[in-house]
Amino acid sequence: VGPRLHQGGIEMPVTKAGVETREPIGWSGKSKDDPQVLELKTHLETNNGIKGLQILGSNEVDEAVSLFKRDGFVVIGDVLNSEQIDILASGCNEVINEVALLDPDNHGNRGSHRYSFGGSSLTRSQLHRPAWQMLLDVPVLSKILTRIFGSTDYILRAASGDFCLPGAVDYQPLYSDVNDWFEGGKTPFSSFFDWRGQISLRDLPAPYICANFLPQDVTRLNGATRQIPGTQNSRAKIPNLKEEPEWMKLSTVCPAPAGALMLRDVRAWHGGTPNLSDATRAIPNLEFYAPWFREPLVPGISYQDYKKLSVHAQQLVRFS
């Protein structure tokens, strides 16, 4: 079933039984008319979003680098044209339909109604899909990453992202994508260890950067990413949901238009927020390792598809 686009958003055009309808998938559990849901919806409509959020132009590379280093994230608008937005939305919708039909109760793999694009693939990546391959050649992305990393020798880690269905009524706890290595237990992804005990991962330059692309408008109600500015270098304990102050829950990257790019230092604290709309919110991404940082990668693209890529894209995915 193909995607139905409306007002810059992706609407799920299938029911749990796979029958085409005007009703979107989602809203398992609490009803959208539940008093608590309606109260939260009113609260978010009034208060949600980072105050003074800057959406930069694609030519403001210097400012983008400056804001990224200060805040741990930056948003650049008009990175994708309308055709690219449609291609990306269609590609996301293919995965969303496949995953949603396998999970009729919307349990998710990142919490209720929440899913990882990478987590739905054996390779932890969607690099085999043309929609994600297209993103490798976005000009402004390479300009900004080269400036941040100080080199063109960065590589692709994965082509992933996440989506949340309407009816994701709960907040996801704040977290960081990377941690220091620790003895005992399971070593986290992209961990770092200083045997002298002097330097933390948070004292280093960004080890890897996540590039999120928006195939739909991100609004106050459809599950915007909450991002806590300046936390990429913080050694403080990340608060749980009970400890988290209200201002952090409202510190979301919205409103942001379809076609925008959000670059994130993955060390910064971030988390999912409620999607109280009637449309799925998708944020596909590309993840890049700094030239000095490496860890084992799972191949995510066939050699046949690799040969079809541009020279620039081939350089990025040479270990993917």
Give residue spans per PLM region.
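Catalytic core of non-heme Fe(II) oxygenases with the double-stranded beta-helix
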Residues: 170-255, 295-301
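Short, solvent-exposed loop/turn segments at secondary-structure junctions
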Residues: 80-82, 161-168, 179, 217-220, ...
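Active-site rim elements
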Residues: 128-134, 198-199, 248-252, 271-273
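Extreme N-terminal basic, low-complexity initiation segments
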Residues: 2-7
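Non-heme Fe(II)-dependent double-stranded beta-helix
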Residues: 9, 13-71, 77-193
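A structural signal for short, well-ordered beta-strand segments
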Residues: 159-161, 211-213, 284-288
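Non-heme Fe(II)/2-oxoglutarate
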Residues: 9, 13-53, 102, 233-245, ...
